[in-house]
């Protein structure tokens, strides 16, 4: 089974760069305190790094 990580949005996407809003949408995050469980891949890690100031990651 693939390793998964939990990603929680902690800050609003209002007044953020359009690229960062699109990244949150790509991660499946919709609003503050929304949590999704994702497969740990290099692509997902790159997306998380791009919006690291708006999300919290649990291994």
UniProtKB/Swiss-Prot annotation:
Task: Please give the GO cellular component terms listed in this UniProt entry.
Answer: cytosolic large ribosomal subunit
One Pfam entry for this protein is Ribosomal_L30
Output the CDD domains linked to this UniProt entry.
Ribosomal_L30 (cd01658)
**What InterPro entries has UniProt attached to this entry?**
Ribo_uL30_ferredoxin-like_sf (IPR036919), Ribosomal_uL30_bac-type (IPR005996), Ribosomal_uL30_ferredoxin-like (IPR016082)
SUPFAM superfamilies of this UniProt entry? Ribosomal protein L30p/L7e
Q: Tell me, what is one Gene Ontology molecular-function annotation carried by this entry?
A: structural constituent of ribosome
Q: Name one GO biological process term.
A: translation
| UniProt keyword terms in alphabetical order | Ribonucleoprotein, Ribosomal protein
Name of the protein in its database record = Large ribosomal subunit protein uL30
The scientific name of the source species is Haemophilus ducreyi (strain 35000HP / ATCC 700724)
What is this organism's lineage?
A: Bacteria, Pseudomonadati, Pseudomonadota, Gammaproteobacteria, Pasteurellales
